[in-house]
Design a protein with these regions (language model features):
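Polar helix-capping/helix-linker motif
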Residues: 28, 44-47, 114, 125, ...
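Aromatic-lined, polymer-binding surfaces characteristic
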Residues: 80-257
Length: 304
C-alpha cells in the first residue's frame, strides 16, 4: 500500500511539473518566435456562409456593429467566463448585419490582435481559437475586405500564427469534438490562403480522427447516433469546402460520408430514442434543411 501511494504521489508530481514546464514554454519568447515563422499571403478563397450554416446557429435578429462599444470591448473585466469565451471566439460576427461598417469590425479585430499577439491560455484554447479563425475568414466581407495593406498584413500574420499554434497543440486535446473543430479551422485556413502545408495537415488529421473514431463497419465506436450525426455534419462540411474551392476530395472522405449517410438515412426516420449509449431523441430538421441547401436531396442521400 505504501509503495502504491508513493508511486501515485511521484506520478502526480511528475505530471504537475510537466504541465508547469509546458505552460512556461508556451509563454516563452522561443515558442513565440517558433510560431511566428510565417510566409505572408492574402486570402484568395472565401467559404460561402451557406456551407458553414451547419456549424453556426445564426441569431435571427441581426446586430449592428455600430451598437457595440468598440473602444472598450476588450477591457470589460466583469464578464463571466462563458461570456468572455463567446466574445473571444468571435462567433457573434455571424450575427452582425452585413450592412454594418467594415471599418468598425476591423478596428475591433485589430484591438484584439494587439492585445493577444502572443499565446494566452484564456484566449488561445483549441475550441475558442478554432471558432475565431473560422469566423474571421468566413466573415471576410466585414473582417478583411475594404481594408488597407497594413491591416491585412496584421490580420494575415495573426491568423497564420494562431494556426501554427493550433497545429502544435491540437494532438494534446482530449476532446474529439475540439479536435474536429480545430481540423476544420486548419483546413479552411489552408484553402483560403492556398497554403498546402495547412491543408495537407488538416486532411491528414481528419483521416486520423476517422481511423481512431470508427469501427470496421464505419460506425462510431461510441455507438452513439448523436455522435454519428455530429461526424456526418462535419465531414459533409469539409467535402463541400473542398468542392467549392475546386480541390480534390480524398477517397476516404467520400467513403466515410457514404457509409454514415446510409446509417443516417435509416436512423433519421426513427422518431423515438434508440437504445445506444448517450442517445437522446434528436431533432434532425435543421440538418435536413442544410442538406437541401447544399443540394443533397432525400432520394439521393443513401448514395451521398
Amino acid at each position: 500500500m505504501y509503495l502504491k501511494n508513493s508511486l501515485s504521489f511521484i506520478n502526480e508530481f511528475f505530471n504537475t511539473s510537466k504541465n508547469q514546464i509546458r505552460k512556461l514554454y508556451l509563454k516563452s519568447n522561443f515558442y513565440n518566435n517558433k510560431i511566428s515563422k510565417i510566409e505572408i499571403s492574402n486570402i484568395t478563397y472565401r467559404p460561402s456562409l451557406s456551407i458553414l450554416s451547419c456549424l453556426v446557429k445564426y441569431d435571427k435578429k441581426k446586430i449592428k456593429i455600430e451598437e457595440l462599444d468598440k473602444d472598450n470591448i476588450w477591457e470589460n473585466e466583469l464578464l463571466s467566463n462563458n461570456n468572455l469565451n463567446k466574445l473571444n471566439n468571435f462567433y457573434w460576427l455571424f450575427s452582425i448585419d452585413l450592412k454594418s461598417s467594415p471599418s468598425i469590425t476591423q478596428s475591433i479585430i485589430i484591438k484584439w490582435i494587439e492585445k493577444n499577439q502572443s499565446y494566452n491560455s484564456l484566449t488561445w484554447q483549441t475550441d475558442i481559437l478554432s471558432k475565431r479563425i473560422i469566423s474571421w475568414i468566413a466573415n471576410s466581407k466585414l473582417s478583411y475586405d475594404e481594408s488597407d495593406t497594413k491591416y491585412k498584413n496584421k490580420f494575415n500574420f495573426s491568423v497564420n500564427k494562431q494556426i501554427n499554434h493550433l497545429i502544435n497543440e491540437i494532438s494534446k486535446s482530449r476532446s474529439v469534438n475540439d479536435k474536429l473543430l480545430g481540423c476544420i479551422a486548419i483546413i479552411i485556413t489552408g484553402l483560403s490562403y492556398a497554403n498546402e502545408k495547412f491543408l495537407n495537415y488538416g486532411l491528414e488529421l481528419l483521416k486520423k480522427i476517422i481511423i481512431n473514431s470508427f469501427d470496421d463497419e464505419y460506425f462510431p465506436k461510441t455507438r452513439s447516433i448523436r455522435q454519428l450525426n455530429f461526424y456526418l455534419k462535419y465531414f459533409v462540411l469539409v467535402r463541400e469546402l473542398l468542392k467549392e474551392s475546386f480541390n480534390d476530395i480524398p477517397e476516404y472522405l467520400d467513403e466515410i460520408i457514404f457509409y454514415l449517410g446510409k446509417s443516417y438515412s435509416v436512423f433519421s426516420k426513427i422518431e423515438q430514442s434508440l437504445l445506444f449509449n448517450g442517445n437522446h431523441q434528436n431533432d434532425l430538421k435543421e440538418f435536413n434543411k442544410y442538406l437541401s441547401l447544399i443540394h443533397i436531396s432525400e432520394p439521393t442521400r443513401p448514395y451521398w
